[in-house]
């Protein structure tokens, strides 16, 4: 599209023009009324947000929740295992919900039974454990468990159950089954009743491809063979992804087992799924454990147990989540009322996916190279073969893949929520990305695990980016997503037109005169502010330069009897105003995690880093740590530490200053557990007074907590480095390491790039101070060359030695102006372009050795002597000589 746009100028591409004219017409929306109005009424929380992870979890509507809570307020629901009136009401309501579920899937209780589970994964586990497997013997055949390689982890995990009982598991590639379908043969040896199980997804959660539902009958009848083994085949259809946006007719496609998760369909409740079991297969299921409510009779002292006759009651151990089951009724009612049914949702979501697919496929760099690589087994020609999922990786103009983690960070700057990784589907990930089994093992050895941010290893992607649509998705969402791709990859805010989408509530094409169509303008300007950014434009936005721009900052007043100058300071020997190469120019600590910096010229060093650096953090009412990613206004909270009075003074505009003691009162302190970067830390609440102060400032409940002095949080092995012998680094509430160092020359290089005029002749100016504050470093040095610090393995600052752990992988927080709280995504984007692969800036440090028997300090003006990586073995050489090898 972009390449063509260079020739056709500003010609807009209509929504109808994006489709094949010969293709069947598809609907957008749900009849009379604007979809925008529905969004505003039912999903007002999405204002300013583009949510594109519906395959992960779709969203509940406001009226759905209101209807459910009203039900709870008006009725008394007791335990369904009791016999009182409220319990009878619960039992009868739950049974009605079972019927409603069966009706939703076009079947009845004559054919299927609904077994409630904790989710589709629990339903799969139930089948794996209860299926009538026959173990393979020395001279006898056994059952086979076959599964499509394009399956969720929870399906593949069933093989561990079968392996334990000597049942062979066989993965089947989609292409092998497609080719087998073409040459399907008649059933062989129909008298053999050895039970086998074949599992496949109705829709791939990786690419959205939809596999033929006809496979169910073909496999069961013996016309299609997953493997050439005689016996009776049963079919498990993993419908969790498929039924979120499409109707499933179980009267026509009678799979034996169908696991589903309800939050995939209407967002709430979570933690509730079901296994739909065909009644002809139900008697074959075997069960070992029995829980409450599943027994007709049993003896506690003898091996006597009679199960319930009802299949559902036999397998639903304990009390089901009956209130969540009742919530399903309101989910089905709301879905029907808002959309008219699953067929409409199917058409609507596919329309969005098809349009996005065509637009993405057409995006090109000026040199003709594609902007994205889409992983798909279809051309998005029909909702029968493709669901509303698009899986892709972003490319640069040379065809190199941009890591998915980097794309995710950029998307968050545009308030776009998407999914990255392999999506719990390693088989499809390997197939589409060309990752061999050996590469998977190699990636694991390199430190990559499922769900992390290690997106590229030796230039090879370990995963991809996925967007997916739900019933409340709109063309506005698509436009915002396309603007994001164009803005970040084609480096323009106006030269490349975004397709203009005209959609009516029935057919594609230009809207009729009397329609209430959603018309999406081709706007390429700056995106609208998110709710957080809107909040920042109010009265509490100001320049807090008094905190960070007061240079030089007077050193803290310390007890002179205990704080004599150390060799570290004496070794610097550099007077203020006469700073030479490789000296410390600025020192910052951040007493409250994610809040404003406290700049000093001289500060004590503790065993966790600078004394009191990130010793406190702000948490929400659930005890979850807040960062500037969720609450940019944290940077407007200004802490000051007074070591003499042993207090921290906290200031913010419009608020009276408040004092917090530096240490806890051990007699009154109640220790509680918190988490920082997956680590458990012991903390204590700093009291109701500061909690009220913070809650008033942020407009929501907040607490200030401090790491307990008895808390021991050890540094992990990261960045591929071991700690030096004899050291055991401990951490405060920092994310990664004790210190972060940045180089002024590196800031200058980024400053130059940011202040370069763009194609429109505009200039976006960032001061050096602004840029340096965004990176929230502890130590700033004035090195000679940009990014030379990335070649260092150790440094000495005076007599203190530090190990260089590795680079800091930057996130979207660097886009937040630390003096105003406003966002500007260009900082991250420019850094991403200049660093090419990873968005790295600054180096993590930790103490190589530290003797705290006498006070130690870091000071502005101290000399910084680096040790190069290639010379790290030669510790006998003076650091200055090693440095001169490359800088002289």
Swiss-Prot record:
The active site is at 424. One of its GO terms (cellular component) is cytosol. Changing residue 121 to M: In XAN2; uncertain significance. GO terms for molecular function: lyase activity; molybdenum cofactor sulfurtransferase activity; molybdenum ion binding; pyridoxal phosphate binding. Keywords: Disease variant, Molybdenum cofactor biosynthesis, Phosphoprotein, Pyridoxal phosphate, Transferase. It catalyses: Mo-molybdopterin + L-cysteine + AH2 = thio-Mo-molybdopterin + L-alanine + A + H2O. Pathway: Cofactor biosynthesis; molybdopterin biosynthesis. It is an enzyme of class 2 (transferase). One of its GO terms (biological process) is molybdopterin cofactor biosynthetic process. Changing residue 591 to S: In XAN2; impairs Mo-molybdopterin cofactor binding. Its EC number is 2.8.1.9. Its cofactor is pyridoxal 5'-phosphate. The modification Phosphoserine is found at residues 34, 528, 530. InterPro entries: Aminotrans_V_dom (IPR000192), MoCF_Sase_C (IPR005302), MoCo_sulfurase (IPR028886), MOCOS_middle (IPR005303), PyrdxlP-dep_Trfase (IPR015424), PyrdxlP-dep_Trfase_major (IPR015421), Pyrv_Knase-like_insert_dom_sf (IPR011037). Sulfurates the molybdenum cofactor. Sulfation of molybdenum is essential for xanthine dehydrogenase (XDH) and aldehyde oxidase (ADO) enzymes in which molybdenum cofactor is liganded by 1 oxygen and 1 sulfur atom in active form. In vitro, the C-terminal domain is able to reduce N-hydroxylated prodrugs, such as benzamidoxime. Belongs to the class-V pyridoxal-phosphate-dependent aminotransferase family. MOCOS subfamily. This is Molybdenum cofactor sulfurase. The gene is MOCOS.
């Amino acid at each position: 599209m972009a390449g063509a746009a260079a020739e056709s100028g500003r010609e807009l591409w209509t929504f109808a023009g994006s489709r094949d004219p010969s293709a069947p017409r598809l609907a957008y929306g749900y009849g009379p009324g604007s979809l925008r109005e529905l969004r505003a009424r039912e999903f007002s929380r999405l204002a300013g947000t583009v949510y594109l992870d519906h395959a992960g979890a779709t969203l509940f509507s406001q009226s759905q929740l209101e209807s459910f809570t009203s039900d709870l307020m008006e009725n008394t629901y007791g335990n369904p295992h009791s016999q009182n009136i409220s319990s009878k009401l619960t039992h009868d309501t739950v049974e009605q919900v079972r019927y409603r579920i069966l009706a939703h899937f076009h079947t009845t209780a004559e054919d299927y039974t609904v077994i409630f589970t904790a989710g589709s994964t629990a339903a799969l586990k139930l089948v794996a454990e209860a299926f009538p497997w026959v173990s393979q013997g020395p001279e006898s055949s056994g059952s086979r468990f076959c599964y499509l390689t394009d399956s969720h982890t929870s399906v593949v995990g069933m093989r561990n159950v079968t392996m334990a009982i000597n049942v062979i598991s066989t993965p089947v590639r989609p292409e092998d089954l497609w080719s087998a379908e073409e040459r399907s043969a008649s059933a062989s040896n129909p008298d053999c009743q050895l039970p086998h199980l074949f599992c496949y997804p109705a829709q791939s959660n990786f690419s959205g491809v939809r596999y033929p539902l006809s496979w169910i009958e073909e496999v069961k009848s013996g016309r299609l063979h997953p493997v050439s083994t005689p016996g009776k085949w049963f079919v498990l259809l993993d419908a969790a992804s498929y039924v979120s946006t499409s109707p499933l007719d179980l009267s026509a496609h009678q799979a034996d087992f169908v696991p589903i998760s309800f939050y995939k369909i209407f967002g709430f409740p979570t933690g509730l799924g079901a296994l739909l079991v065909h009644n002809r297969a139900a008697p074959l299921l075997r069960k070992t454990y029995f829980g409450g409510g599943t027994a007709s009779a049993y003896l506690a002292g003898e091996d006597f147990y009679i199960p319930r006759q009802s299949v559902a009651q036999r397998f639903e151990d304990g009390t089901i989540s009956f209130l969540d089951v009742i919530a399903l009724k309101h989910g089905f009612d709301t879905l029907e009322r808002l959309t008219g049914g699953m067929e409409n949702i199917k058409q609507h979501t596919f329309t969005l996916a098809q349009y996005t697919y065509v637009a993405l496929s057409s995006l090109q760099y000026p040199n003709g190279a594609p902007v994205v690589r889409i992983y798909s087994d279809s051309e998005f020609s029909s909702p029968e073969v493709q669901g509303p999922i698009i899986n892709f990786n972003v490319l640069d103009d040379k065809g190199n893949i941009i890591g998915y983690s980097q794309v995710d960070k950029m998307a968050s700057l545009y308030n776009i929520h998407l999914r990255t990784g392999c999506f719990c589907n390693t088989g499809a990930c390997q197939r589409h990305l060309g990752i061999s089994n050996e590469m998977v093992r190699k990636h694991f050895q390199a430190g990559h695990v499922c769900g992390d941010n290690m997106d590229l290893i030796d230039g090879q992607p370990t995963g991809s980016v996925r967007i997916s649509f739900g019933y409340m998705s709109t063309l506005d969402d698509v436009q915002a997503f396309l603007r994001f791709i164009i803005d970040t990859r084609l480096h323009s805010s106006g030269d490349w037109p975004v397709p203009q989408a005209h959609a009516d509530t029935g057919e594609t094409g230009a809207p009729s005169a009397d329609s209430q169509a959603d018309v999406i303008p081709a706007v390429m300007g700056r995106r609208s502010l998110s709710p957080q950014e809107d909040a920042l434009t109010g009265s509490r936005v100001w320049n807090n330069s008094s905190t960070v721009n007061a240079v030089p900052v007077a050193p803290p007043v310390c007890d002179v009897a205990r704080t004599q100058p150390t060799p570290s300071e004496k070794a610097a020997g550099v007077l203020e105003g006469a700073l030479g190469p490789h000296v410390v120019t600025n020192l910052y600590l951040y007493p409250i995690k994610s809040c404003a910096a406290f700049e000093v010229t001289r500060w004590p060093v503790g065993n966790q880093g600078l004394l009191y650096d990130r010793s406190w953090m702000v948490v929400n009412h659930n005890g979850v740590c807040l960062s500037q990613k969720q609450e940019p206004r944290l940077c407007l909270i200004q802490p000051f530490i007074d070591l003499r009075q042993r207090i921290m003074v906290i200031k913010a505009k419009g608020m009276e200053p408040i004092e917090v003691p530096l240490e806890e009162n051990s007699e009154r302190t109640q220790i509680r557990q918190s988490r920082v970067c997956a680590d458990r830390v012991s903390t204590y609440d700093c009291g109701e007074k500061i909690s009220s102060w913070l809650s008033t400032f942020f407009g929501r409940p907040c607490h200030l907590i401090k790491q307990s002095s008895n808390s021991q949080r050890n540094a992990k092995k990261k960045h591929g480095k071991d700690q030096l012998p004899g050291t055991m680094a401990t951490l405060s509430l920092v994310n990664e390491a004790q210190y972060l160092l940045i180089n002024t020359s590196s800031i200058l290089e980024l400053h130059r790039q940011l202040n370069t005029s763009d194609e429109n002749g505009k200039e976006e100016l960032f001061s050096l101070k602004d840029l340096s504050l965004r990176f929230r470093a502890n130590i700033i040095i004035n090195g000679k060359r940009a990014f030379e610090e990335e070649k260092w393995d150790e440094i000495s600052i005076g007599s203190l030695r530090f190990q260089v752990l590795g680079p800091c992988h930057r996130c979207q927080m660097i886009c937040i102006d630390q003096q105003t709280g406003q966002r500007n995504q260009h900082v991250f984007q420019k850094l991403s372009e200049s660093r090419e692969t990873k968005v790295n800036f600054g180096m993590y440090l930790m103490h190589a050795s530290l003797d705290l028997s006498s006070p130690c300090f870091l000071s502005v003006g101290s000399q910084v002597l680096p040790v190069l990586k290639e010379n790290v073995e030669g510790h006998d050489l003076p650091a200055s000589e090693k440095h001169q090898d490359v800088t002289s």
